[in-house]
Regions:
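Intracellular juxtamembrane helix-capping segments at the cytosolic ends
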Residues: 120-134, 335-349
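Juxtamembrane intracellular "pre-TM" segments in multi-pass secondary transporters
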Residues: 2-10, 201-238
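Helix-loop boundary and gating motifs at the non-cytosolic
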Residues: 2-60, 232-271
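C-terminal membrane-cytosol helix-exit motif in multi-pass small-molecule transporters
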Residues: 156-168, 186-205
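Helix-loop junctions at membrane interfaces in 12-TM secondary transporters
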Residues: 97-111, 314-326
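Glycine-rich segments within core transmembrane alpha-helices of 12-TM secondary carriers
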Residues: 142-164
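Structural signature of the two symmetry-related core transmembrane helices
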Residues: 82-97, 297-312
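Helix-to-loop junctions at the C-terminal end of transmembrane segments
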Residues: 65-79, 281-295
Length: 352
């Protein structure tokens, strides 16, 4: 039986289509452009890779620290959508600003801000899943989001890639081509968000109290105490913190790593484009498998696969190796992201 999305579910899925364009930009074009800026400033490949890794880590750390309180505030009536919009604006405006940063250090600072805005929006976006669908549909809806995100993000990426690779033919500089690419990505991101902003209504919430921020901290403390009593929830949260960071590290660092190894930039971009097309059907497949098998077991399969992928990445020595890596990442990337999101939403009470 064909799985059909409701209007609210479609609006929610479209945000994945929008924000995935930024994710693809971060994992493909952005590291190569930063390498270009770094080389012009006299930085070595070792320094370039290290600084890029530091920036990604700083953004991850900031989001990890602010995540719990943001998640708690998201449950307060009337807070989720406005703070989501603020995070979106920070991410999108910073994305555009990256195109005008010609200094490598300034570029990194803006990148960290863009990453924080992007990741912050996902905290509120993921929490919207319980508001737009039923618990028995979450695995499929979450998988559809990632699947269409992978394939939909290819549209602005391909347009940007054509402009960048054909900059000489068009008669524009590399810097101008990159600026256009950042603007295209941010515009796509914002446009794909509009249906969600129009159709989303918060269904589950706790009533707003006079001092909402203070109450959010108090509720966060209570939630942590409750989580400690729930062994299953506690262990998943602990594991999730580590394995999902590993997944995103591989996504963020893949192109930078390949570029530092001296692999052809065009080949790297095309390989990661293939990752998107491979990830599309497998994200949907994992969503359907979750209807027959336990999500926990499927997540474990993906974790083991990602461990093998990380080990294989240590021995990359050619373009062919990178293509093999890209294909296997595509197979398991959608599954581990989609199932983790829906499983997390299902085991956590809607108002916590």
């Amino acid at each position: 039986m064909k799985f059909k999305l409701t209007k609210k579910e479609k609006s929610w899925v479209l945000y994945d289509v929008g924000n995935s364009a930024f994710t693809l930009l971060v994992s493909t074009i952005m590291p190569i452009y930063f390498n270009y800026l770094a080389e012009n400033a006299g930085l070595s490949d070792v320094d370039y890779l290290a600084y890029w890794g530091y920036a990604a880590s700083i953004a991850t750390l900031v989001v990890a620290l602010m995540g719990p309180i943001c998640g708690t505030m998201a449950d307060t009536k009337g807070y989720k959508k406005p703070i989501f919009i603020i995070s979106l604006c920070i991410g999108a405006v910073s994305c555009i600003s990256l195109g005008f940063a010609k200094n490598w250090l300034l570029f990194l600072v803006i990148f960290v801000i863009a990453k924080i805005g992007f990741s912050g929006s996902l905290i509120f976006y993921d929490s919207m899943l319980s508001d737009v669908t039923k618990i028995e549909r979450m695995d499929n809806v979450s998988s559809q989001g990632f699947a269409w995100g992978y394939i939909g993000s290819c549209i602005p990426f391909i347009i940007s890639l054509v402009i960048i690779l054909g900059s000489d033919v068009i008669g524009i500089s590399m810097e101008t081509a990159m600026t256009i690419a950042f603007i295209i990505t941010a515009t796509w991101w914002i446009i794909m968000t509009l249906p969600l902003l129009k159709n989303y209504k918060q269904k589950y919430y706790v009533e707003k109290k006079p001092n909402a921020v203070k109450e959010s901290f108090a509720r966060l403390v209570r939630t942590f105490k409750n989580v400690r009593k729930e062994k299953k929830v506690f262990l998943f949260l602990l594991a999730f913190f580590f394995y999902i960071d590993g997944v995103y590290s591989i996504i963020d660092m893949a192109t930078a790593y390949g570029s530092a190894l001296g692999l052809d930039s065009t080949g790297l971009l095309l390989a990661l484009l293939v990752t998107q097309f491979v990830a599309f059907p497998f994200a949907i497949l994992f969503g359907r498998l979750a209807q027959k098998y336990e999500a926990e077991k499927l997540i474990m399969v993906c974790i083991v696969a990602y461990f093998c992928i990380a080990v294989f990445a240590m021995f990359i020595a050619s373009q062919l190796h990178f293509w093999i890596l890209a294909i296997f990442v595509g197979i398991f990337q959608g599954g581990i992201q989609a199932l983790s999101r829906s499983y997390f939403t299902k085991i956590i009470p809607v108002n916590q």
